Amino acid sequence: AGKLPTVTFYKPQGNLNEHSGYADVAKGDEHIADVLRHLEKSPQWDHMLVVVTYDENGGWWDHAAPPKADRFGPGSRIPAMIISPFAKKGVVDHTLYDTTSIIRFITHRWSLPTLPGVAMRDEAMAKAGGARIGDLTDALVLQ
């Protein structure tokens, strides 16, 4: 316990990844809940941010059209949850995020230079009149 690197990515094995058609969504939910229970017991928990997200929307219908940018996205909405002692409690954050928001947060947190692909995404969004893509900080209470 307490030995996770500063940044860790975890992807469940296929039968637990909640992909419709071949994975059991309920078992995937149970698995993620179990992982979170273990993380919450970790000595690192007080300084941890967990983002649970997916690589696509799974083909489920969504009433909201994707934001306009270039042909590369951002695409349709995907679910994401922030679980952390730093998460704003009882809040649904309406900031526009995409999968680069995780990279944006890491970049912000450690004062790293913006990656070229992220800068290109920002340019495409601005040219299309789209909203700024967030870096997760709007969902957090940081000191």
What annotation goes with each model-predicted range?
Residues A1-Q143:
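N-terminal pro-sequences and low-complexity stem/linker regions of secreted or lumenal proteins
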